[in-house]
């Protein structure tokens, strides 16, 4: 009896952990994707921000308001909007 209760609880914990990982997947970037975004995709293109400043997408981290240059979105670093 105790073993079946333990198995059910363990199954629920694993199910919750998997669903949490799927929800949080957009918040974390794999090391390979991070390196690709910093080096492979960096073409040193300057993009004007709303305030009139200029930035390079690979060198600006997202601020507390998750603001990025125009045409970019926050995903740890400011990255081009795809699609």
UniProtKB/Swiss-Prot annotation:
* Tissues with expression: Expressed by the venom gland.
Entry annotated with the keyword Flavoprotein: no
Propeptide residues, per UniProt?
Answer: 22-53
UniProt GO cellular component terms: extracellular region
User: According to the UniProt record, what happens if one changes residue 59 to A?
Assistant: 49-fold decrease of binding affinity to Nav1.4/SCN4A
Specify the domain of life of the species encoding this protein. Answer: Eukaryota
Any S-S bridges, and between which cysteines? 55-69, 62-74, 68-78
What UniProt keywords apply to this chain's record, in alphabetical order?
Amidation, Disulfide bond, Ion channel impairing toxin, Knottin, Neurotoxin, Potassium channel impairing toxin, Secreted, Signal, Toxin, Voltage-gated potassium channel impairing toxin, Voltage-gated sodium channel impairing toxin
Q: Which residues get modified to Isoleucine amide? A: 82
Quote the function comment for this protein.
This gating-modifier toxin shows an important inhibitory activity on sodium channels. It is very active on Nav1.7/SCN9A (IC(50)~0.6 nM), and also shows activity on Nav1.3/SCN3A (IC(50)=292 nM), Nav1.4/SCN4A (IC(50)=2.2-159 nM), and Nav1.5/SCN5A (IC(50)=2.3-2.9 uM). It has also been shown to inhibit tetrodotoxin (TTX)-resistant (IC(50)=27.6 nM) and TTX-sensitive (IC(50)=30.2 nM) sodium channels in rat dorsal root ganglion neurons. Lower inhibitory activity has also been shown on potassium channels: Kv4.2/KCND2 (IC(50)=604.2 nM), Kv4.3/KCND3 (IC(50)=425.1 nM), and Kv2.1/KCNB1 (IC(50)=14.3 uM).
Give the misc comment: Negative results: does not inhibit Kv1.2/KCNA2, Kv1.3/KCNA3, and Kv1.4/KCNA4 channels. Shows an extremely weak inhibition on Kv4.1/KCND1.
- Would you tell me the protein name for this molecule? Beta/kappa-theraphotoxin-Cg2a
Q: Which organism is it from?
A: Chilobrachys guangxiensis
Q: What is the lineage of its organism?
A: Eukaryota, Metazoa, Ecdysozoa, Arthropoda, Chelicerata
């Amino acid at each position: 009896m105790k073993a079946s209760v333990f198995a059910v609880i363990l199954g629920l914990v694993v199910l919750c952990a998997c669903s949490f990982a799927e929800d949080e997947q957009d918040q974390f970037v794999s090391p390979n994707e991070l390196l690709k975004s910093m080096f492979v995709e960096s073409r040193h293109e300057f993009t004007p921000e709303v305030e009139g400043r200029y930035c390079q997408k690979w060198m600006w981290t997202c601020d507390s308001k998750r603001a990025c240059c125009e045409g970019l979105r926050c995903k740890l670093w400011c990255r081009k909007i795809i699609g």
